[in-house]
Amino acid sequence: TQPRYLIGFKNGVYDLRENAFRAHKPEDWLLNHNGITFTQPLAANECLEVHASNFYKWLSHAAGRDAGKMERIKAGLFMVLANRSDWQLFLEITGEGGSGKSVFTHIATLLTGEHNTASGNMAALDSARGRAQFVGKSLILLPDQSKYVGEGTGIKAITGGDLLEIDGKYEKQFSIILQ
C-alpha cells in the first residue's frame, strides 16, 4: 500500500516526514495521485485570507466565522488530502441547506482525485456486491442519506477493521479490509 507519509500529486510527491516536495520515485510504490499539480507556496507569509480569498470566504461562511470550527474543517480536509484514515474513518458533515456541505464534498473530491472517489449509500455497504464499488477508493461519499433501515453490518465491519467480502460483477469473490 501507499505510504501514509506521501501525498501523490501529478508532478511529484509531498513527503510529510521531510516536509518537502520532490519528484516521483518508483520505490514510493504510488499507484495513483490526486491529479493536482503541486505549486510551491508564494512566500513565508502566505495566508488563506489573501491568497485563497474565495476558499476563505466559503470557510468563514461554513463555520459561521467561528475560528475553532474553521480549524476543524481545515483539519478534515487535510485528513482527506493526506489519506489519514488512521485518524478518523468517517466524517459526518451536517447542516442546513446552503451551509457548505456540498462545497466541502467537492473540495474533498478534488483533494483525493475523482478517480479515487466513490459515491454510494448505506445499503451498498451491507452487501458484498455493493461494496465492490469502494475497493481501491480513498474517499467514499454517502450523500444525503434518507432514513436507513438495515443492520449496518458493513459499516460496523469497516470501522472495526474487519475483513469484508467483495463480490464484483464477473470477478472472483475476495476479502479485503477497506480503509
Where are these predicted regions, by residue range?
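P-loop NTPase catalytic core of nucleic-acid-dependent motor ATPases
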Residues: 2, 6, 13-138
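Conserved AAA+/SF3 P-loop NTPase catalytic/coupling segment centered on the Walker-B
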Residues: 138-161, 174-175
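AAA+/SF3 P-loop NTPase mechanochemical coupling elements
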Residues: 129-136, 167-179
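Anionic group-transfer/hydrolysis microenvironments
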Residues: 17, 145, 169
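Substrate-gripping "pore-loop 1 plus following alpha2 helix"
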Residues: 118-126, 153-172
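Short, well-ordered loop/turn and helix-capping segments at boundaries between secondary-structure elements
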Residues: 83, 110, 114, 147, ...
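A broad "ordered helical/assembly scaffold" signature
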Residues: 77-88, 153, 163, 174-178
